[in-house]
């Protein structure tokens, strides 16, 4: 009869090691989108819409910044409008005094 020596048994892992990954990060949100609502009164220089590219085009009294941000050139009321069949624009109409 063979006698087993239990103190010499090796225990192997039943799960693989965790390893590492190159994922697990995310960039901060850029806070893009509308900053003024339709019908809202804004002052000159106010940011109306932050975007990457031209999702919305500048209309009357609206300028476009270097990063495609749309801003009001004059004080007035914001209007989001259609420009043709498939484009949108934002305009600022001065308040009549």
Swiss-Prot record:
One of its GO terms (molecular function) is structural constituent of ribosome. The N-terminus is cleaved by ribosomal processing cysteine protease Prp. InterPro entries: Ribosomal_bL27 (IPR001684), Ribosomal_bL27_CS (IPR018261). Disulfide bonds: none annotated. One of its GO terms (cellular component) is cytosolic large ribosomal subunit. Residues 1-10 have a biased composition (Polar residues). Residues 1-38 are annotated as: Disordered. Pfam families: Ribosomal_L27. GO terms for biological process: translation. Belongs to the bacterial ribosomal protein bL27 family. HAMAP family: Ribosomal_bL27. NCBIfam families: L27 (TIGR00062). This is Large ribosomal subunit protein bL27. It comes from Streptococcus equi subsp. zooepidemicus (strain H70). The gene is rpmA.
């Amino acid at each position: 009869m063979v006698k087993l020596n239990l103190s010499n048994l090796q225990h192997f892992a039943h799960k693989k090691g965790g390893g590492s990954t190159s994922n697990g990060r995310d960039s901060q949100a850029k806070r893009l989108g509308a900053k003024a609502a339709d019908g809202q009164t804004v002052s000159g220089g106010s940011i109306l819409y932050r975007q990457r590219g031209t999702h919305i085009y500048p209309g009357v009294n609206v300028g476009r910044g270097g990063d495609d941000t749309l801003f009001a050139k004059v004080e007035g009321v914001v209007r989001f409008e259609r420009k043709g069949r498939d484009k949108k624009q934002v305009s600022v109409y001065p308040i009549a005094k």
